[in-house]
């Protein structure tokens, strides 16, 4: 009888120990799962955060293109050609943009204020910026007497730059003087005014003379080929029908010669004015 009672006590003790073990194991496992669950971020949050970082990094890359290597004179290292177009916008601007897009080439436009005021042209001005082109100013009137004799160069350029800003949202500082900076900007006083206004000036290294070669695109091509002699060239052209015809062949020529196509970047500005004023 005593032995039977001892067995019962032993069985009860064993069951109690087993029950306690089960409770402890269950509790431990539950806390383990909770801890593990909390340590894993929600999938949507993790992916959203990761995507946001990636997007920000991509946008930063777009906003801050890598700085080009420069020569002592400030020009880029290597063979680089800048195609530039004056006197727009016009009814041909869209067609010029079509050719440039097809050829994967970015360029620099110098636009005239009186043309920028034409609302029919403004969509292509916006398009030019969206497609990676730079738009600088070419005065309001293109009138040499007003610009250089009557002291309206800086006021007209400021007005044109403001128009570009209103249309595109960009804030350009580069201008091209109608007929070039020589002799128009010969006087130091006018150049001081330009510097005070924070304006930069670009002339050109190659004059295609396209404006006077109506119906003769082949001669424009020959002019460009013949006068291309340096590693860094800035080609002056205009929004003319004959230039539009010549453009694909000009692009082909530079590609075959191993040139990269540059678009003006204020961070990489280099002096290019006939007055050789380093401030401009």
Spans of model-derived segments:
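Active-site beta->alpha N-cap acidic-glycine motif
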Residues: 57-148, 152-166
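Short phosphate-engaging motifs
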Residues: 38, 92, 242-246
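A composition/secondary-structure signal for short, hydrophobic, low-basic-content segments
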Residues: 52-54, 134, 234
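Catalytic domains of cell-wall/extracellular-matrix polysaccharide-remodeling enzymes
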Residues: 142-255, 259-266, 274-279
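Alpha-helical transmembrane segments
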Residues: 24-31
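N-terminal Sec-pathway targeting helices
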Residues: 5-23
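N-terminal, intrinsically disordered, polar/charged segments of Gram-positive cell-envelope systems
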Residues: 2-7, 32-81, 106
């Amino acid at each position: 009888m005593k032995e039977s009672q001892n067995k019962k006590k032993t069985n009860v003790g064993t069951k109690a120990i087993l029950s306690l073990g089960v409770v402890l194991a269950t509790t431990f496992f539950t806390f383990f799962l909770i801890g593990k669950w909390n340590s894993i971020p929600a999938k949507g949050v993790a992916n959203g955060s990761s995507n946001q970082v990636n997007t920000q990094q991509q946008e930063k890359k777009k906003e801050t293109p890598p700085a080009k290597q420069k020569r002592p004179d400030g020009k880029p290292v290597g063979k680089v050609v800048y195609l530039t177009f004056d006197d727009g916008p016009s009814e041909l601007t869209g067609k010029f943009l079509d050719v440039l897009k097809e050829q994967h080439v970015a360029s620099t436009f110098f636009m005239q204020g009186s043309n920028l005021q034409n609302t029919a042209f403004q969509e292509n001005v916006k398009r030019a910026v969206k497609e990676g082109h730079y738009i600088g100013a070419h005065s309001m009137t293109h009138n040499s007497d007003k610009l250089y004799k009557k002291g309206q160069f800086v006021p007209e350029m400021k007005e044109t730059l403001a128009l570009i800003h209103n249309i595109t949202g960009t804030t350009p500082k580069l201008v091209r003087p109608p007929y070039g900076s020589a002799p128009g900007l010969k006087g130091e006083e006018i150049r001081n005014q330009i510097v005070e206004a924070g304006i930069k000036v670009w002339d050109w290294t190659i004059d295609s003379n396209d404006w006077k070669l109506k119906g003769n695109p082949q001669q424009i091509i020959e002019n460009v080929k013949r006068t291309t002699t340096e590693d860094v060239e800035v080609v002056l052209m205009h929004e003319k029908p004959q230039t539009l015809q010549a453009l694909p062949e000009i692009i082909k020529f530079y590609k075959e010669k191993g040139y990269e196509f540059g678009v003006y970047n204020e961070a990489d500005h280099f002096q290019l004015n006939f007055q050789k004023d380093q401030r401009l």
